[in-house]
Regions:
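N-terminal leader/targeting and pre-domain segments
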Residues: 10-18, 23-29, 33, 41-78, ...
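Membrane-embedded hydrophobic alpha-helical segments
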Residues: 1-11
Length: 389
């Protein structure tokens, strides 16, 4: 009897995969729901070992992920097809009937892909917060996808690796309050709308390198137990990382922040690298703790830089940077005294190997630090020794 059921499932699987290639959207959607049901059935099958059930289900998960990754020609007309009517100078000028045909096809395909994500999402959520769902033991590969529809994968639990690298999000994308028990890749991706990763837990490496965020980017109150890598990213709107904990290396180097960035109240237990970055507006690092090295070298900060109320237990390197606005170690945003403390070393403002000094564009800096730590030695110009305007 089990063999008969398994054979029937494979027949249904074959037919459902064929349906995914059908020209009719309802037929394709029917194939999706058949595949989803088959995964659930395999997981409920008690006559085979759990690992075998997972293996059978993984085959179907791979098909569903491949459908999400597959190209869709009309995405190149996204800007026009998301309008209510043809634009005056667009591709569909004087082609109104074709516009509405393509718009209907565009919406149908978006609905199919949204349905896949919703079914996966629902099964990645356990009964309680931060607990696995029925599909949490599968691996997911969405790399290189174009998400031309909103993505909601909040409160998801992934027990295995997950890959979103090289993807493009043309609407909002929210991954907040999720748990990743293995590595996760969001690198080389672009976000046209708001991107949310707040309140998440990363047990393995979290890789966000080389990404571009055109809308607001939220990573607040997250915990990274493996390395966290944001190197080479560009933020065109506000970026919020405040209240996070990094237990291993945290790399934000060689990034560009076109608006303000908030990294307040964070703890870095490994090396923290912000070097080689550009801050066009204000950068707020206040109230943070650095257990090892902290690199802010070779950066440009065009606005106010807040580094007060923080503890630096290892080396802190600011050499070769340019602070056009005020640099503040001593007070909060409103002028109340909250000096930082340098526990083992005075902060470095001049690189020893090449004598590259930090430059300042403001005379309103505050270099007051706690007496219980190392001081910032100032020259006659009121700047750290070796530095200038």
């Amino acid at each position: 009897m089990p063999e008969k059921h398994n054979a029937e499932r494979r027949e249904r699987y074959t037919k459902a995969v064929e349906q995914l290639g059908n020209a009719s959207a309802p037929v394709r959607l029917g194939g999706v729901y058949t595949l989803v049901s088959l995964v659930d059935e395999w997981l409920r099958e008690e006559n085979i070992e759990y690992n075998e059930r997972i293996a059978e289900g993984q085959v179907i998960i791979n098909i569903l992920c491949a459908y999400i990754r597959s190209p869709f020609a009309l995405t190149s007309h996204y800007d026009e097809l998301t309008q209510d009517s043809p634009t005056a100078e667009g591709l569909y000028k004087n082609r109104e009937q074709e516009f509405y045909i393509d718009k209907a096809e565009f919406k149908s395909e978006a609905d199919i892909r949204l349905s896949i994500l919703k079914e996966i999402h629902r099964r990645l959520q356990g009964p309680d917060e931060n607990t696995p769902g029925a599909w949490s033991d599968f691996e997911y590969d969405f790399s290189g996808s174009i998400f031309f529809y909103p993505v909601d994968l909040t409160r998801s639990y992934y027990a295995k690796p997950v890959n979103f690298s090289g993807s493009a999000y043309w609407d909002e994308a929210d991954f907040s309050y999720s748990t990743y028990m293995d590595e996760v890749y969001f690198s080389e991706s672009s976000y046209q709308g708001r991107a949310g990763f707040n309140g998440s837990i990363y047990q393995g490496e979290a890789v966000f390198r080389g990404s571009t965020y055109r809308g607001s980017a939220g990573f607040a109150r997250s915990t990274y137990r493996g390395g966290a890598y944001f190197t080479g990213s560009t933020y065109l709107s506000e970026a919020v990382f405040r209240g996070s904990v990094y237990r291993c290396a945290a790399a934000f180097n060689n990034s560009a922040y076109q608006y303000w960035v908030d990294l307040r109240g964070s703890t870095y237990q490994g090396a923290a690298d912000f070097g080689g970055s550009t801050y066009q507006y204000w950068a707020d690092f206040r109230g943070s703790t650095y257990r090892r090295w902290a690199y802010f070298n070779d950066s440009i900060c065009c606005g106010w830089a807040g580094l007060s109320h923080s503890v630096y237990e290892g080396e802190a390197d600011f050499s070769g940077s340019v602070f056009c606005g005020a640099l503040n170690f001593g007070t909060d945003f409103f002028g109340k005294p909250f000096p930082s403390r340098f526990v083992q070393n005075a902060p470095c403002f001049v690189a020893e190997n090449d004598a590259l000094a930090t430059l300042f564009g403001s005379s309103s800096n505050n270099f007051v630090v706690e007496d219980s730590g190392y001081p910032v030695s100032l020259g006659a110009n009121g700047l750290p020794l070796g530095c200038g305007f």
